[in-house]
């Protein structure tokens, strides 16, 4: 089976219960299946907390975090440091052989500045699959933060959904975006099982899909188009359903290419 990229988001990193559930599901899945898995993560909540402690402003533009030069070191520390090693610690606790990486390791993702107005925010494009294929072939679980580095050595904060898409393209992998919500919800708060670009545009125009979810849906649509295959948005809260999800059963919203 082709590899599966699991992108973790939301308050997952803040919740011990959620991490316990997730890694228990990952462990049991890996024992029963040969499918190579890759975890990609951001850590927005962690960064927000840190900014608050340091009395630094949090500014978002169209759902993307503005990252000034004087904040990129702090954000790199939170994402590539604390968030990455926290996930690594959970993997080790569950006897999973994991490796903590960033987008730049092995040139897995090519990163360029996205927009000068956003500061150190990067645009992710597929890179070389060599390092990750070597690790997956040896049975490791790569845990990859959404910090990238440009060709001229600038640290960049990359939207984790977009980072996961670029990695999926690099590896020819399937992609699941795991978040706090059980998928995309309609105006009545009901889960939408399948979503096309046309349906998404309608819901965005009607103001039903807003803020960070717009970025998530657009990232999933972009991923589905780029990869030429469906992408799932689902919740980590339903831990009992995660093994089925890892096997290709939709439990949230399936975004169609």
Curated annotation (Swiss-Prot):
Site (Transition state stabilizer): 7, 216
An annotated GO cellular component: cytoplasm
Disulfide bridge map: none
EC number(s) on file: 2.7.2.8
Residues annotated to bind substrate: 43-44, 65, 157
Stored Pfam families: AA_kinase
Record bears the keyword Protein transport: no
One biological process term in Gene Ontology: L-arginine biosynthetic process
Localization per record: Cytoplasm
CDD domains: AAK_NAGK-NC
Cited InterPro entries: AceGlu_kinase-like_sf, AcgluKinase_fam, ArgB, Asp/Glu/Uridylate_kinase, NAGK-NC
Keyword set, alphabetical order: Amino-acid biosynthesis, Arginine biosynthesis, ATP-binding, Cytoplasm, Kinase, Nucleotide-binding, Transferase
GO MF, one annotated term: acetylglutamate kinase activity
Pathway the protein takes part in: Amino-acid biosynthesis; L-arginine biosynthesis; N(2)-acetyl-L-ornithine from L-glutamate: step 2/4
Binding positions (ATP): 180-185, 208-210
Subunit details: Homodimer.
Function: Catalyzes the ATP-dependent phosphorylation of N-acetyl-L-glutamate.
Protein name: Acetylglutamate kinase
The organism of origin for this protein: Serratia proteamaculans (strain 568)
Lineage, opening ranks: Bacteria, Pseudomonadati, Pseudomonadota, Gammaproteobacteria, Enterobacterales
Chain's gene name: argB
């Amino acid at each position: 089976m082709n590899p599966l990229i699991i992108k973790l988001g939301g308050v997952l990193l803040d919740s011990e219960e959620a991490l316990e559930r997730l890694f228990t599901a990952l462990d049991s899945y890996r024992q029963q299946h040969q499918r190579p898995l890759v975890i990609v993560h951001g850590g927005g909540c962690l960064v927000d907390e840190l900014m608050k402690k340091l009395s630094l402003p949090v500014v978002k533009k169209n759902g993307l975090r503005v990252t000034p030069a004087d904040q990129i070191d702090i954000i790199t520390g939170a994402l590539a440091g604390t968030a990455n090693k926290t996930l690594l610690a959970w993997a080790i606790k569950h006897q999973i052989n994991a490796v903590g990486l960033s987008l730049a390791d092995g040139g897995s993702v090519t990163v360029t500045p996205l927009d000068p107005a956003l500061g150190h925010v990067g645009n992710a494009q597929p890179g070389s699959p060599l390092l990750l294929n070597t690790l997956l072939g040896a049975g490791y679980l790569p845990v990859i933060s959404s910090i990238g580095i440009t060709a001229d050595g600038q640290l960049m904060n990359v939207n984790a959904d977009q980072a996961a898409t670029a990695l999926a393209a690099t590896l020819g992998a399937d992609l699941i975006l795991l978040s706090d919500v059980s998928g995309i919800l309609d105006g009545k708060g009901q889960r939408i099982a399948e979503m096309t670009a046309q349906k998404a545009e309608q819901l965005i125009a009607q103001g039903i899909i807003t803020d960070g979810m717009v970025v998530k849906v657009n990232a999933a649509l972009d991923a589905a188009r780029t990869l030429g295959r469906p992408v799932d948005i689902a919740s980590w809260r339903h831990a009992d359903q995660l093994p089925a999800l890892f096997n290709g059963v939709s439990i949230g919203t399936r975004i169609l290419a």
